[in-house]
Each structure stands twice: as C-alpha cells, then as structure tokens.
Amino acid sequence: MSQNQEFSKKEIYNLNKLQKRLRRNVGEAIADFNMIEDGDRIMVCLSGGKDSYTMLEILRNLQQSAPISFSLVAVNLDQKQPGFPEHILPEYLEKLGVEYKIVEENTYGIVKEKIPEGKTTCSLCSRLRRGILYRTATELGATKIALGHHRDDILQTLFLNMFYGGKMKGMPPKLMSDDGKHIVIRPLAYCREKDIQRFADAKAFPIIPCNLCGSQPNLQRQVIADMLRDWDKRYPGRIETMFSAMQNVVPSHLCDTNLFDFKGIKHGFEVINGGDLAFDREELPLQPAGWQPEDDENQLDELRLNVVEVK
C-alpha cells in the first residue's frame, strides 16, 4: 500500500513539474509576442486532440494567476464526420464550467464531393474550417483566436516550405487574418510535442481521433515529422537549436535581396552585423543553443561540433 502511495506521489510530482514547464513555455510565448492583452476574449479552438486540450488547460491555469483579465470561450467545429462522438466535448466542457459553443457545419460532405476518393482532403478542409472559425469569432465577439500548434508543428512547416516550396517560411506564433479582422495566436509555440503528449496522457483527456474523415495522411509532413524525431533521438539539442535559429535570423548572411541590400555594399559601407565569415570558420558553442536536458536523463558529454560535420 505504501509503495502504491509513494508511486502516486511521484506521479503527482512529475505532473506538477510538467505542468509548470508548459505554463512557463506558454507564458513566455504570450509575453514575447504580446498574444493576450487586458480585456481580451480568447476563442480557444478545441478539436478534441491532445494539443487543444492542453492549450485550454494551460490557459485556464494562467487565467487564475495572470496580472491581466481575459476570458475564454471554447469552440468546436462539428464537421459531421461519420462516427464523430458529439457528446464528448460538451460533457467535458460543462464539467469544467467553461463557456463553449459547438458549431455544426457539414464540411465533410462538401470535401467528399470535391476531392476524389483516396486523396488528401486536409487543404480544402482547413480553408473551409478557417472561414467558419473567423465567422464564429465575430459572432462571439472574440478579440483573439487561439490555435493549438506547438513548436514541432512550426519546425515541420519550416522544413516543408524549404524542401517542397522553396521558401524559408514557418508558422507564425501570431498573425493577422487576410481580411485584417482577426488576430490568430498560437500559445503553445514554445511547447514541445513530447511534453504535450505526456501531459495529455497524465490528464487522461477524452481524445477524439483525428482521422474520422478518412483522409489519407499528408505524406510530405509525415516524412518531415519522422526526420525531426530521428534527429531529436540521435542528436539531442538539435531541435532546440533549429527553433532558436528561427528567432535569430541574420538577413545579411542569407541570399534574399528583398531582405538585405547586397547591391548597396560598397567601399566605406558600414560593417555588417554578424562578422566577416568569408575566410574564417565560424566557432560553434560547446552545447547546442537552447537545449535543456530531460529531467530524467543524465547530462550528456559536451561535444564541439564543426559546421561541416553536422549531417
């Protein structure tokens, strides 16, 4: 009995520690990008997946201790997919006492009519969903729309655009909609997917499957996700370093003439920030930038990496 109690205490301790980390990550993202302001009404898009459940839980937690006042309203879009468990989210949200709205729109029928069988429907589905959510935000008087994308999603999008789109473009933590009427925020931008997964498992959220529509998976995104997971396993700290790189862009050391006036460089031109690397080999830090060891793993030996050795 005492052993079970001790195990339970350890689980509670680990959960609290994990929740604090997620809170810290979300709090830092909110502060860095000014995501939430006093008096905001945040529409939390709740799909029934681990990410959106975690986002709602952490925002509710922060709401109790934040120095500013903001309200939350959870919104789920029931797209009339076969087998969608309509009762799960209302029961969960009523138990929490969270204001919510279930929007019923048969986007599934539209997508099935337009997209051939066996093809990926995610692109059309997301466009339809976006329009409905923008309209709902207006109806609810929401000042911000919160989506549950996390750090891994942002990195995957960066590599998708690099590998398949020829652009160095990721997924912004905060953006203005094309019509200029809605601000979209991603409070989980600094959160690791594996932390979210552990938190969701520990909290036993009533997860709704994401493949009810029968769409084929996005194979390109899956390839990128597998690649990043492999890197994270073989090279601890690489994911953190890559995300840190997205926050430390040096346009003068890239090749985009729209971002930097290379033609304007002449004798007497001021020194470019970042140094002269035309002849010198850049020294990299002993430890990957932004890397933090797992709570339950030993500190790895520090390795000095050379830029030509990074695979």
Swiss-Prot record:
GO MF terms, alphabetically ordered: 4 iron, 4 sulfur cluster binding; ATP binding; magnesium ion binding; sulfurtransferase activity; tRNA binding
Its cofactor is:
Mg(2+); [4Fe-4S] cluster
Motif segment (PP-loop motif): 47-52
Q: Cofactor binding mode, per the note?
A: Binds 1 [4Fe-4S] cluster per subunit. The cluster is chelated by three Cys residues, the fourth Fe has a free coordination site that may bind a sulfur atom transferred from the persulfide of IscS.
Q: GO BP, one example?
A: tRNA thio-modification
Q: Where does [4Fe-4S] cluster bind?
A: 122, 125, 213
Report the NCBIfam families cross-referenced here: PRK10696.1
**Where found, per UniProt?**
Cytoplasm
Q: Give the organism, scientific name.
A: Escherichia fergusonii (strain ATCC 35469 / DSM 13698 / CCUG 18766 / IAM 14443 / JCM 21226 / LMG 7866 / NBRC 102419 / NCTC 12128 / CDC 0568-73)
Question: Tell me, how does this one assemble?
Answer: Homodimer.
Instruction: Note the InterPro entries from the entry.
Output: Rossmann-like_a/b/a_fold, TilS/TtcA_N, tRNA_Cyd_32_2_STrfase, tRNA_thiolation_TtcA_Ctu1
**EC class of the enzyme, as a word:** transferase
Phylogenetic placement of the source organism? Bacteria, Pseudomonadati, Pseudomonadota, Gammaproteobacteria, Enterobacterales
Protein family according to the UniProt entry: Belongs to the TtcA family.
Q: What is this protein called?
A: tRNA-cytidine(32) 2-sulfurtransferase
Q: What else is known?
A: The thiolation reaction likely consists of two steps: a first activation step by ATP to form an adenylated intermediate of the target base of tRNA, and a second nucleophilic substitution step of the sulfur (S) atom supplied by the hydrosulfide attached to the Fe-S cluster.
Keywords for this entry? 4Fe-4S, ATP-binding, Cytoplasm, Iron, Iron-sulfur, Magnesium, Metal-binding, Nucleotide-binding, RNA-binding, Transferase, tRNA processing, tRNA-binding
Name the chemical reaction catalysed here.
cytidine(32) in tRNA + S-sulfanyl-L-cysteinyl-[cysteine desulfurase] + AH2 + ATP = 2-thiocytidine(32) in tRNA + L-cysteinyl-[cysteine desulfurase] + A + AMP + diphosphate + H(+)
Q: Name one Pfam family in it.
A: ATP_bind_3
PANTHER family reported for this sequence: AMINOTRAN_5 DOMAIN-CONTAINING PROTEIN, SULFURTRANSFERASE-RELATED
What Gene Ontology cellular-component terms does the record carry? cytoplasm
**What coarse category fits the chief subcellular location reported for this protein?**
cytoplasm
Task: State which pathway it belongs to.
Answer: tRNA modification
The EC number(s) this enzyme carries? 2.8.1.-
Q: What is this protein's function? A: Catalyzes the ATP-dependent 2-thiolation of cytidine in position 32 of tRNA, to form 2-thiocytidine (s(2)C32). The sulfur atoms are provided by the cysteine/cysteine desulfurase (IscS) system.
